[in-house]
Amino acid sequence: MGRAGFVAGNWKMHGSLVRNQELLDAVVSGTRSLQNVSCVVCVPYPYIAQTQSVLEGSHVLWGGQNVSQYHHGAYTGEVSADMLADLGCRYVIVGHSERRTLFGEGNQVVAEKFRAAQERSITPILCVGETLAQRESDETEQVIAMQLDAVIDLAGIEALGQSVIAYEPVWAIGTGKTATPQQAQDVHKFIRSRIAVHSGGIAENIQILYGGSVKADNARELFTMPDIDGGLIGGASLVAAEFISICLAAQN
């Protein structure tokens, strides 16, 4: 049996109490028929409690967009994995390209956040990917290998096997350039082969998502690629009809 589908919505810094309620209600209603696909929404910290109250008992799961590498202490403004767990979060995004680029999170910090989440039974969605400059210098595989190796070195290959990976082609986000389904597949295949160096079983079973501007009109073509198991969805996750269509596309 093949890997199950997985679609995670990343709301980024968007939302309001009124809009959230409408969006979440629509997503729950519109994805009731989903089979063999996990549907997750990763929302801003202040809205996690609201999201929990709306989604609890439904088939839609929720998570955070970031987590501290520390479990408690004098870290003003940080949110720990314990706090996310208190609010029922099953997943958290770590290493998103915006965190790496805008907030200077390097591979070691990302690995520590990955480990902190797992220590509180939260599944990390580990983001990896290369910039335009790195791609044009033919460094894609080297960059992604380093991002994966940092986690494997700190937490171990078995821990990586208990996560979800998302490939973000940073070079294709907001640059006017587009990654074709085949380009995405090529990198997903490399990620799987890199993991297979440590464990063939984990490489075969781990879910790898594509995070490069997935929309309703390109989701099905992307998800038919053999090593693409779903998507990490940005802007389209804020539009109920778009997000629902993407989730349904992941069934195939």
UniProtKB/Swiss-Prot annotation:
SUPFAM superfamilies found in the cross-reference section: Triosephosphate isomerase (TIM) (SSF51351)
InterPro entries linked: Aldolase_TIM (IPR013785), TIM_sf (IPR035990), TrioseP_Isoase_bac/euk (IPR022896), Triosephosphate_isomerase (IPR000652), Triosephosphate_isomerase_AS (IPR020861)
Catalytic activity field: D-glyceraldehyde 3-phosphate = dihydroxyacetone phosphate
Positions annotated as active site in the UniProt record: 96, 168
UniProt keyword list: Cytoplasm, Gluconeogenesis, Glycolysis, Isomerase
Localization of this protein: Cytoplasm
Listed EC numbers: 5.3.1.1
GO molecular function annotations of the record: triose-phosphate isomerase activity
Functional note: Involved in the gluconeogenesis. Catalyzes stereospecifically the conversion of dihydroxyacetone phosphate (DHAP) to D-glyceraldehyde-3-phosphate (G3P).
Protein name: Triosephosphate isomerase
